[in-house]
């Protein structure tokens, strides 16, 4: 069994790490590089950085902090935010990022996935999917431009259909951001993640809902995800990564130590 990964997520806005609840009302958490260094020291397996307003504001993630992060940490990290071209992706990889994640730009132009995969290989192409449960239709749907409340919009895609589409186009990994659970620390959406797991042949990362160590255990065992992403429980020091790894190992889960 491959070891499960623990992935702190750092949402970036105006050069600071922020955190909201259900993708709204973001508050400043701290500075990018010190937080990245702290999580690397605690034992994170990798980091994910989302420049949350880049796509909505028609710009690309700021490369200056990408290079500073690369100088300070020795674990892999992924960056996202407004990446729409091969050249933009190449620059970010050259500045030290190990993976590129695209979300809204892929919804606008799905062929971008294939072009990035052809250029760099699927191992470094991650697709972020912002999924919400629509009670009126009793279905999971994909939203776009979620980093800016004013710009957020519905798309034509049902979540499971989009998961299948991005795999056909060559993504190497999927992060499922469950919007209904985000920031509320009530547990991962096991039901939705299990449905996606059944049709997902690439590594699947759960995002949204972590509040206790048991939530990580449950998502690994019940939804069979490859990695668990979390933000507020790490930012607020509710859970220490090293202690979480010890807990998961004691629960019989293969974890990187």
Curated annotation (Swiss-Prot):
GO terms for molecular function: imidazoleglycerol-phosphate synthase activity; lyase activity. It holds the Pfam family His_biosynth. It catalyses: 5-[(5-phospho-1-deoxy-D-ribulos-1-ylimino)methylamino]-1-(5-phospho-beta-D-ribosyl)imidazole-4-carboxamide + L-glutamine = D-erythro-1-(imidazol-4-yl)glycerol 3-phosphate + 5-amino-1-(5-phospho-beta-D-ribosyl)imidazole-4-carboxamide + L-glutamate + H(+). Keywords: Amino-acid biosynthesis, Cytoplasm, Histidine biosynthesis, Lyase. The active site is at residues 11, 130. IGPS catalyzes the conversion of PRFAR and glutamine to IGP, AICAR and glutamate. The HisF subunit catalyzes the cyclization activity that produces IGP and AICAR from PRFAR using the ammonia provided by the HisH subunit. Disulfide bonds: none annotated. It is an enzyme of class 4 (lyase). Heterodimer of HisH and HisF. It is found in: Cytoplasm. This is Imidazole glycerol phosphate synthase subunit HisF. Belongs to the HisA/HisF family. One of its GO terms (cellular component) is cytoplasm. Gene3D superfamilies: Aldolase class I. Its main location: cytoplasm. It comes from the Bacteria. Its EC number is 4.3.2.10. GO terms for biological process: L-histidine biosynthetic process. Pathway: Amino-acid biosynthesis; L-histidine biosynthesis; L-histidine from 5-phospho-alpha-D-ribose 1-diphosphate: step 5/9. It comes from Shewanella sp. (strain W3-18-1).
């Amino acid at each position: 069994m491959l070891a499960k990964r623990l992935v702190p997520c750092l949402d970036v806005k105006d050069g600071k790490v922020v955190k909201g609840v259900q993708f709204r009302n973001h508050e400043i958490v701290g500075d990018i590089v010190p937080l990245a260094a702290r999580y690397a020291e605690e034992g994170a397996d990798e980091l994910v950085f989302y420049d949350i307003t880049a796509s909505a504001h028609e710009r690309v993630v700021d490369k200056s902090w990408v290079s500073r992060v690369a100088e300070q940490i020795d674990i892999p990290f992924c960056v996202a935010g407004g990446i729409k071209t091969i050249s933009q992706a190449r620059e970010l990889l050259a500045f030290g990022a190990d993976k590129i994640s695209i979300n809204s730009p892929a919804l606008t132009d799905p062929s971008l996935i294939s072009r990035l995969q052809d250029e760099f290989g699927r191992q470094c192409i991650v697709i972020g999917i912002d999924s919400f449960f629509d009670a009126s239709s009793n279905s999971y749907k994909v939203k776009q431009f979620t980093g800016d409340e004013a710009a957020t919009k519905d798309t034509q895609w049902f979540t499971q259909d989009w998961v299948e589409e991005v795999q056909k186009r060559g993504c190497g990994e999927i992060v499922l951001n469950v919007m209904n659970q985000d920031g509320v620390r009530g547990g991962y959406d096991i039901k939705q993640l299990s449905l996606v797991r059944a049709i997902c042949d690439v590594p699947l990362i759960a995002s949204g809902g972590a509040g206790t160590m048991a939530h990580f255990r449950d998502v690994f065992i019940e939804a069979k995800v490859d990695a668990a992403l979390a933000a507020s429980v790490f930012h607020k020091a509710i859970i220490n990564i090293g202690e979480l790894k010890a807990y998961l190992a004691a629960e019989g889960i293969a974890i990187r130590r």
